[in-house]
C-alpha cells in the first residue's frame, strides 16, 4: 500500500476474525490464531486512505481477489482469477477492461495468479546483481509494522497509531 500510495501510514483501524480456516487444528493444545477475514483501513500522511478487504475462504465467488485503486481521475480494478484489469475514467465516463493472459506454467510455478513467480524472478536478478533491489529491508520492516498495527487494531477494537509500533 505505502509504496503504491507514495506516503507513510499514520493510523489503522480494523475488524477481523478467525471464523472458518484452521479451527479444527491444534498445536500443543492451542488453535492457530490466524485471522481469516478482515477489513483494515489505513490513513496516510498525504491524506490517502487504503482498505484491505481480506477473506481467505471466498474461493467460490466470481472474483475471489479484488484489488482496487480509486483517485480523482477514476478507478482501476484487478479481478482474479479471471485476470481482468478494468479502468473507469471520470473524463469520459467509460469503463475499459482487458483480460491479461498469464501462461499456465507461470500459474503452476507460484501462487497469486503468477505474482509469486515474478517476485521470485526479480529477487533472483537482484541477488545475481542483474537488477536493482525492488523492495528493501526497510520496506519489509514497515510492512511487518503495518501488519502488527492492524492486528492490534482488530484484537483491541481501537484505532492504532503507527507510532505505537515504532513508525
Regions found by a protein language model. Give the residues of each.
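Short acidic/polar mixed-charge low-complexity motifs
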Residues: 8, 46-48, 72-75, 131, ...
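Rossmann-like dinucleotide-binding domain that binds NAD(P)(H)
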Residues: 1-62, 138
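C-terminal helix-rich "cap/oligomerization" subdomain common to oxidoreductases
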Residues: 45, 88, 122-167
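Mobile, glycine-enriched helix-loop/loop "lid" segments at the mouths of ligand-binding/catalytic clefts
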Residues: 4, 77, 82-100
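Hydrophobic alpha-helical segments typical of transmembrane helices
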Residues: 8, 65, 93, 119-123
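Glycine-rich Rossmann NAD(P)(H)-binding loop
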Residues: 53-57, 70-72, 163
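Short glycine/proline- and acidic residue-enriched helix-loop micro-motifs
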Residues: 101-108
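Active-site loop of classical SDR/Rossmann-like NAD(P)-dependent oxidoreductases
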Residues: 108-120
Amino acid at each position: 500500500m505505502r509504496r503504491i500510495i507514495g506516503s507513510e501510514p499514520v493510523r489503522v483501524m480494523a475488524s477481523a476474525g478467525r471464523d472458518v480456516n484452521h479451527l479444527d487444528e491444534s498445536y500443543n493444545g492451542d488453535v492457530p490464531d490466524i485471522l481469516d477475514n478482515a477489513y483494515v483501513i489505513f490513513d496516510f500522511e498525504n491524506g490517502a486512505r487504503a482498505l484491505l478487504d481480506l477473506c481467505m475462504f471466498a474461493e467460490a465467488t466470481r472474483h475471489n481477489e479484488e484489488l482496487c485503486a480509486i483517485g480523482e481521475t477514476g478507478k482501476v480494478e484487478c479481478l482474479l482469477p479471471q485476470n481482468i484489469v478494468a479502468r473507469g475514467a471520470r473524463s469520459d465516463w467509460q469503463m475499459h477492461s482487458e483480460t491479461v493472459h498469464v501462461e499456465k506454467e507461470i500459474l503452476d510455478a507460484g501462487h497469486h495468479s503468477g505474482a509469486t513467480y515474478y517476485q521470485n524472478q526479480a529477487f533472483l536478478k537482484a541477488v545475481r546483481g542483474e537488477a536493482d533491489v525492488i523492495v528493501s529491508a526497510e520496506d519489509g520492516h514497515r510492512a511487518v509494522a503495518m501488519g502488527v498495527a492492524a492486528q492490534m487494531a482488530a484484537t483491541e477494537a481501537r484505532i492504532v497509531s503507527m507510532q505505537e509500533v515504532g513508525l
